[in-house]
Amino acid sequence: MSTFPTPNMALTTILVVADIERSVAWYRDVLGAELYREYGESSAVFSFTGAWLLLVTGGAPTPDKPDVEFAAPIDPTTVDHSFTIRVEDCRAAYGTLRERGAEFLTPPYDWGGEIRCFFRDPDDHLFEISQAG
């Protein structure tokens, strides 16, 4: 029996996007992720804070994922996943990301034990920056 997980495993998050060129520019220039590799006009891999982000355009079912279709988010008011980026200074991160073009839902909000705010990528994937209070 093999071991799972193994020490050299890595988790990659797949995000379905409508326009790969627009998304590559946003993840590189706004979020500050490092572009690792592009695969034509259908996908791109980024390294960000020790994690992998794979951006893909939509896709039909395949033999290894029958009955599963990849599609970009449709309704920005309904979220089935989000990303939390823990930072030392939420307000500073907010300022930097706004300068780069990130569009926030609100300025940082102080909950007492946490300061946080949310922004979206061009396809409405939700990101949170959070500072422990």
Regions from the PLM with identified roles:
Residues R22-S23, C90-Y94:
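Short, conserved charged micro-motifs
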